[in-house]
Amino acid sequence: SSSLSLETKDKDKIVMTYCNLVNKLKTLKKEIYVVEVCEGDYFLREVAEKTNTKLIPIDTPIIAAGKILANARAFVSGRYHPAILASLGGTPCVFMASNSHKTKSLQELLKYENVVEYPVLPSDEEIMSIVQDTSIVIQGGDETRDKIRNRAKELCDNAQTISELIK
């Protein structure tokens, strides 16, 4: 991803960091999938292989990918558009930084109580915080999912009124 390339060119460091993140997330005893969103995420294939984790590849049809994300227990990512797809189904996200304000703004739009963006290459301590935050949002269950889903629907409904305003 462009955020990673700004952070480091060291592919081994990137793969090692994400392997560590995936392995720590596995301690939550939930099924983990690695989601390859764009060509810049190709390194995630190696992460999936090294951690023995299922991969949702870049060529997954958008409707299928959206359904997977919308029904996930949680989504850890710095990717804006997949986070929107996840949010439409109420999936809580734990956000990593991107090279723009978008993921922070999305959290604010969806009225997240704790607006946080973790670094794209998190330290061991930050990985533990990501895992803890992921555990918390999963424990929020249907209440958290309903809150996110309802807010996403409200925003969607509001967006439809824009066409009336600009006629």
Region spans (language model):
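Active-site anion-handling motifs in enzyme catalytic cores
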Residues: 1-167
